[in-house]
From Swiss-Prot:
Pfam families: SRP54, SRP54_N. Disulfide bonds: none annotated. This is Signal recognition particle receptor FtsY. Part of the signal recognition particle protein translocation system, which is composed of SRP and FtsY. It is a peripheral membrane protein. GTP binds at residues 228-235, 310-314, 368-371. Signal peptide: none annotated. It comes from Methanosarcina acetivorans (strain ATCC 35395 / DSM 2834 / JCM 12185 / C2A).
Length: 417
C-alpha cells in the first residue's frame, strides 16, 4: 500500500539527511548524573560501605587495645563507658567472623577473596553513575532546503497530490526545519521523517469527526445519502455501513434511489437479502426522491434507526441528475451526505469530490480500494481540498472490509516499510 509514495518520501529523506549530515557539528557531551532510583537501592548501596567501615574500625580498635594492654598493667576499676566500648568491639568482632564465614561458603574453591574484596567493588552512596550523551546540532536555512524541498514537491505531485496540498506540505516542512538550531542524534532521518509526518497529519486531519458518536447522538431515524459516480463502490460501501450499524445493534432500511441505472435496484436488493434488512424500491425509472421519501416514512413508522439511500451515479456536469439530487435533499433532508470514490483514481477523485461539494455540500468521504492504492494522492488530498473529513476506507470486498479513518494510523502506513 502506497509503495510509490513511500519511494518519493524516501528520496526526500535521503537527500535532506545528506544535507543535515554535512552541516551538523559536534557539541559538548552532556554529562548525565544518575542518582539511585529508590530507597531500596540506597539501602543496598549504603549497607556494604557501613559494614566495611565498622569492621575496619573494629580491627583498628583491637590493635590499639592490644598495644595498650601490653604497655600498661591491668586496671582494677574500669569505667562503664569502657565496658560498653569493649562490648561493642566484641560484637563487631563476632560480626567480622560471621561475615568471613558467609563469604567463604559462597566463594568457589579455586577463587578465594577476602570479605573486603567482596564488598569494595559495590557502588557506594557517595558515588554517582555518569553517562556521556553525545549530540550534534544543525542549523538549516532556506538555501539548504531549496533543492530537497523542490524534489519533495515534485514527488508529491507525481503521487497525484493536488497542487495546493503539495504546497501546504512543503511549506510546513520548511517552517519546521529552517531558522532554528536543532539537536540531532546519529540518525538524521528521524528529524526529516518527524517533520514530514507532522505536515501530512495536519493535511489529512481537516475537520475530522467521529462517525459513530455523531450518528449515536442524532435523532432517529438517521438519514444518510450516498453520492458519487458509477463504478466506484458506492453500493458496496452502503452494504458495509449497513453491516457496521447492525453489528452495533441498530436497525437499518435501505432505499433503492438509483432508478436510473439498469440493475442497480437488483444489486442493492442482493445485499439487503444477505444482510437481512428491508429495502424500499419502486420500478425502474421512477422518481428517486419519491423512493427515498417512502423509505424515510417507513423507518419512522417502524421505528427503524437508519435509512441508507443509494443514488444514481452522476457527474456534476449532468444538470438533470444534479437537479434530482437537490430535490432528494429537499424532500427528505439527509443527516449526512457521503461522497464515495476510489482511492486509486488519485487526483481525479479529489476533483470530483470538490465538484460534488460545490453542487450538493458533502459531509465526508469514503475512499474505496485503498489497499490497491500505490500513490496515496487522493487519500491525502481529499479532506484538505473539500474541507470535509475522510470517514472510512474500503480495504476489500467483504462486509467487514471497512476501516474507520484514523489520521495517525494512516500517516504511519505512509512511512511503514
Amino acid at each position: 500500500m502506497f509503495n510509490k509514495f513511500k519511494e518519493k518520501l524516501g528520496s526526500f529523506k535521503k537527500a535532506l539527511s545528506k544535507t543535515i549530515d554535512e552541516k551538523a557539528v559536534e557539541v559538548e557531551p552532556v554529562v548525565v548524573e544518575q542518582m539511585p532510583q529508590s530507597e531500596e537501592s540506597l539501602e543496598e548501596e549504603i549497607e556494604p560501605i557501613v559494614e566495611e567501615e565498622a569492621l575496619e574500625a573494629a580491627l583498628e580498635a583491637e590493635s590499639s587495645e592490644a598495644e595498650t594492654e601490653a604497655a600498661s598493667p591491668a586496671i582494677a576499676h574500669v569505667p562503664i563507658e569502657d565496658l560498653k566500648k569493649a562490648e561493642y568491639r566484641k560484637k563487631l568482632k563476632d560480626l567480622k567472623k560471621v561475615g568471613e564465614k558467609k563469604v567463604e561458603e559462597e566463594k568457589p574453591p579455586e577463587e578465594k577473596k577476602s570479605f573486603f574484596k567482596k564488598v569494595v567493588p559495590k557502588v557506594g552512596f557517595a558515588q554517582k553513575a555518569k553517562a556521556l550523551v553525545f549530540n550534534r546540532e544543525v542549523y538549516l536555512d532556506n538555501k539548504d532546503l531549496e533543492e530537497p524541498l523542490w524534489e519533495l514537491e515534485m514527488g508529491l505531485l507525481e503521487s497525484d497530490l493536488a497542487l495546493s496540498v503539495s504546497e501546504a506540505i512543503v511549506e510546513s516542512v520548511k517552517n519546521q526545519l529552517t531558522g532554528t538550531t536543532k539537536r540531532i542524534g546519529s540518525n538524521t532521518g528521524e528529524i526529516v521523517e518527524a517533520a514530514l509526518k507532522k505536515a501530512i497529519l495536519e493535511v489529512v486531519s481537516a475537520n475530522t469527526f467521529d462517525f459513530d458518536e455523531y450518528v449515536k447522538n442524532r435523532e432517529k431515524p438517521v438519514h444518510i445519502v450516498f453520492v458519487g459516480i458509477n463504478g466506484t463502490g458506492k453500493t458496496t460501501s452502503i452494504s458495509k455501513i449497513t453491516n457496521r450499524l447492525l453489528k452495533s445493534g441498530y436497525s437499518v432500511v435501505l432505499a433503492a434511489g438509483d432508478t436510473f441505472r439498469a440493475g442497480a435496484i437488483d444489486q442493492l436488493g442482493i445485499h439487503a437479502n444477505r444482510l437481512g434488512v428491508k429495502m424500499i424500491k419502486h420500478q425502474a425509472g421512477a422518481d428517486p426522491a419519491a423512493v427515498i421519501y417512502d423509505a424515510v416514512q417507513y423507518a419512522k413508522a417502524h421505528k427503524i434507526d437508519f435509512v441508507l439511500s443509494d443514488t444514481a451515479g452522476r457527474m456534476h456536469t449532468n444538470m438533470n441528475l444534479m437537479a434530482q439530487m437537490e430535490k432528494i435533499c429537499r424532500v427528505s433532508t439527509p443527516d449526512l451526505i457521503i461522497f464515495v470514490d476510489e482511492a486509486v483514481a488519485g487526483n481525479d477523485a479529489v476533483e470530483r469530490a470538490a465538484q460534488f461539494n460545490e453542487a450538493v455540500p458533502i459531509d465526508g468521504s469514503i475512499l474505496t480500494k485503498i489497499d490497491a492504492d500505490a500513490k496515496g494522492g487522493a487519500a491525502i488530498s481529499i479532506a484538505y481540498i473539500t474541507g470535509k473529513p475522510i470517514l472510512f476506507f474500503g480495504i476489500g470486498q467483504g462486509y467487514e472490509d471497512l476501516k474507520k479513518f484514523d489520521p495517525e494510523w494512516f500517516v504511519d502506513q505512509l512511512f511503514n516499510q
